[in-house]
């Protein structure tokens, strides 16, 4: 049976700890999985967070969304695959471990600690953080298979990556190439496009104009502009656009007459910046400049430039390129094929060498600035050019520049040999598969995704690092390669292993090989340096592994099949794949969402997921990013501690549309906590009365109950709510779901329905009207708790255990089925009509306030004036609610006669009619009522025609003295403010009842406790109160009311000129 609630007040901390204990003791999570094991499959793929640190509000938001979806699908009957994942390789981990160990370079890693120890430390760090993050996620009430997460460091996961790369190789989609790529000089590795997107930050760099002397021409120069002086030693050409107009300009510079060549369209801008005047001497098209040779400004400092000049026909000449623009610079572009993507391509076209005299740490390997970091060389190069007379102007520019996504070092462009996945060959397939098979939430993200795929180049997947999936590429001395697809294949092909520099030949038998390998290297571990030891033989050639590891984005890109252990475990893959749903932050559109589709189309020719949703970032209340420097970081634990898990969860799904950025607000959190407090109070009220009356819904004969209109209305509303919430979740418009729930709890259930039925709950004994209210409340909770369970799992469980479980029998609210709409209960007309009733009550209350009549004093009559048929039906059907809520003896539809005065609105008449405004005003004073009634008229005054509307008039109305009015959307409410003796007596009785009930509350009396009331008051009050003594006794549970000296617990109430005493009857 229903008991009185354990907690009278809503205390999230205690309640949630109690429920956590209940779930744990009763193994609820496992029971739910068992319950749904035969349901239709639903493959939810968890995007793996990096285990590089504690979770933040953004991570929490992400997991809360996921948990809500998983709980929702489970209640729908699905057997949900809910394995959490963790991204455990890559630079995010390496950088943290380097910091912890005080290491700054790759050389220090190899010499001070060693690769094997460094990898061991990375693994320890990753596993330790996995434990911390798991506990943090559990703290939020996230129900996933925490005992069996997928980890990208497991052998079977790595083997999935090898399988995928072998597939790419077999399809001709994996190849080695030399290209110019983003390079991090601190991490000493190449980075892919998707790692750099979103990592452009404002920084200041040099901005210099330099003149290149034209060979054989005295005082004639090519004028170039650059923000990377450090690339000038690698300059091999100057690019011009074939169709642009270029000019030779005569200038006076440093006391000398010189001739500069630059784009005609940029002459004024460039000369203005430099601060010189010029005269155009000659004009020509860019294509006419092709082949013009110049003298390299740093030829002496970089002797290899002399070799290039002699060996390559197009070295140090103007070449033609379409990438040249007129947006900045001079229209002549300094071109270094070893340090720019476009430079590289045009350099290849003209047969230029790919020269990059820079090492992995971004230091020059030769020439004047050998050993110096390139960005530190910038000022030295500028000063040197000035000394040589080639510097025209030096300044500074603030621009967006790419930085390393993990260590935040400014990147450089550098030509290196790397391994690429040829995504360019499958782009069209990716877009086609995406457009045909993937549903995006919101749908406009699909366009953004497709555009990102179109703009992407080949995927550089090699990284010159340590802690990652080793590239399964073995290479012979003559350059032949072989890609290994599995551990078994590696063992089968292995002929030897190298341990501490010593070669150990392996036996031919697979089993015997395994014994030797395990004895010498230890158990299978597909990381470096374990796999580096293997020497394989293919086509009669011995091969050793290339030392690179795989881009960490490839790790997560294969998650949909690697997490299932494919290809080692084919059964799960065949049962579940592709994923039914994924959801991640906005930055993953061009990262994880992209890497998955690219890897999947390469491996399986199709997409790896069917539905994908995107959410925004969490910012502070002002819209700023949370950071240590701003001191505005709010930790998830802090929110849970202050407001509780349910409040935190609901708030994150209620505050904003999921695809928008969430500006975290403590006020919003408190607003949600108040809503849950309201829900709790409705539960406490319901459970308290139901427990007193031993209410049992199983014994109710529903067909015999006389439900009131408000009962039918709330049952209709809660069934309509099912549609609203379900639609909000299904379309990923989560705020529609949460705000519908919020409004239902606060407005429909608490502020309206409970307000309407409170008196019915006070009735003693077996009252059918009270029973109908009990049953209605119980049915509402039955639906509402199911709807709220995925959002607020704790409070719904606590209420369910007391209010519902005794009669339903199922062990947990989370084991219930998602509610289905009872179409027979839905009455849309009633819902519309009740909405008008609420508006009328609001307007009527405002009218009473105008008249200064308290709600406790009844009024004689209320008139509703309306033209709306729905309002008329509502007033007729729900008249008793209006009478009760507005405390009126009579509520009628009618028309009130009042005096109308129409005057000219000179603010409109004057400006519009100017000199004729007096004529128009005179007409309005005489015929204004006609204009008011018709809305607009065309009139002729003294031979002139005018079009007049209600905008041209001001209407003043005079009501009868006994009425006061207030408008509502749909009509107007009139309150008759005449107070008779009978009405005064009734109102005064209500005033005293309210005060006696307040005193009962202060004494913490039970609703069934009886009292004796004694009242000291004025003679007038006593006479009025005696007319309603029965009412006072009934409402206050008093057995007697005496007018004498107040006794017992006494309170003086000056506003009603009384002292009231109450005594509990034992």
Swiss-Prot record:
<feature type="short sequence motif" description="'KMSKS' region">
    <location>
        <begin position="625"/>
        <end position="629"/>
    </location>
</feature>
<keyword id="KW-0648">Protein biosynthesis</keyword>
<dbReference type="GO" id="GO:0000049">
    <property type="term" value="F:tRNA binding"/>
</dbReference>
<dbReference type="GO" id="GO:0002161">
    <property type="term" value="F:aminoacyl-tRNA deacylase activity"/>
</dbReference>
<keyword id="KW-0963">Cytoplasm</keyword>
<keyword id="KW-0862">Zinc</keyword>
<keyword id="KW-0030">Aminoacyl-tRNA synthetase</keyword>
<comment type="subunit">
    <text>Monomer.</text>
</comment>
<keyword id="KW-0479">Metal-binding</keyword>
<dbReference type="InterPro" id="IPR002301">
    <property type="entry name" value="Ile-tRNA-ligase"/>
</dbReference>
<dbReference type="GO" id="GO:0005737">
    <property type="term" value="C:cytoplasm"/>
</dbReference>
<keyword id="KW-0067">ATP-binding</keyword>
<dbReference type="InterPro" id="IPR002300">
    <property type="entry name" value="aa-tRNA-synth_Ia"/>
</dbReference>
<dbReference type="InterPro" id="IPR009008">
    <property type="entry name" value="Val/Leu/Ile-tRNA-synth_edit"/>
</dbReference>
<comment type="similarity">
    <text>Belongs to the class-I aminoacyl-tRNA synthetase family. IleS type 2 subfamily.</text>
</comment>
<dbReference type="InterPro" id="IPR023586">
    <property type="entry name" value="Ile-tRNA-ligase_type2"/>
</dbReference>
<dbReference type="InterPro" id="IPR013155">
    <property type="entry name" value="M/V/L/I-tRNA-synth_anticd-bd"/>
</dbReference>
<keyword id="KW-0547">Nucleotide-binding</keyword>
<feature type="binding site">
    <location>
        <position position="628"/>
    </location>
    <ligand>
        <name>ATP</name>
    </ligand>
</feature>
<comment type="function">
    <text>Catalyzes the attachment of isoleucine to tRNA(Ile). As IleRS can inadvertently accommodate and process structurally similar amino acids such as valine, to avoid such errors it has two additional distinct tRNA(Ile)-dependent editing activities. One activity is designated as 'pretransfer' editing and involves the hydrolysis of activated Val-AMP. The other activity is designated 'posttransfer' editing and involves deacylation of mischarged Val-tRNA(Ile).</text>
</comment>
<dbReference type="InterPro" id="IPR014729">
    <property type="entry name" value="Rossmann-like_a/b/a_fold"/>
</dbReference>
<feature type="short sequence motif" description="'HIGH' region">
    <location>
        <begin position="49"/>
        <end position="59"/>
    </location>
</feature>
<dbReference type="InterPro" id="IPR033709">
    <property type="entry name" value="Anticodon_Ile_ABEc"/>
</dbReference>
<dbReference type="GO" id="GO:0004822">
    <property type="term" value="F:isoleucine-tRNA ligase activity"/>
</dbReference>
<dbReference type="GO" id="GO:0008270">
    <property type="term" value="F:zinc ion binding"/>
</dbReference>
<dbReference type="Pfam" id="PF00133">
    <property type="entry name" value="tRNA-synt_1"/>
</dbReference>
<dbReference type="Pfam" id="PF19302">
    <property type="entry name" value="DUF5915"/>
</dbReference>
<dbReference type="GO" id="GO:0006428">
    <property type="term" value="P:isoleucyl-tRNA aminoacylation"/>
</dbReference>
<dbReference type="GO" id="GO:0005524">
    <property type="term" value="F:ATP binding"/>
</dbReference>
<dbReference type="InterPro" id="IPR001412">
    <property type="entry name" value="aa-tRNA-synth_I_CS"/>
</dbReference>
<dbReference type="InterPro" id="IPR009080">
    <property type="entry name" value="tRNAsynth_Ia_anticodon-bd"/>
</dbReference>
<dbReference type="Pfam" id="PF08264">
    <property type="entry name" value="Anticodon_1"/>
</dbReference>
<protein>
    <recommendedName>
        <fullName>Isoleucine--tRNA ligase</fullName>
        <ecNumber>6.1.1.5</ecNumber>
    </recommendedName>
</protein>
<keyword id="KW-0436">Ligase</keyword>
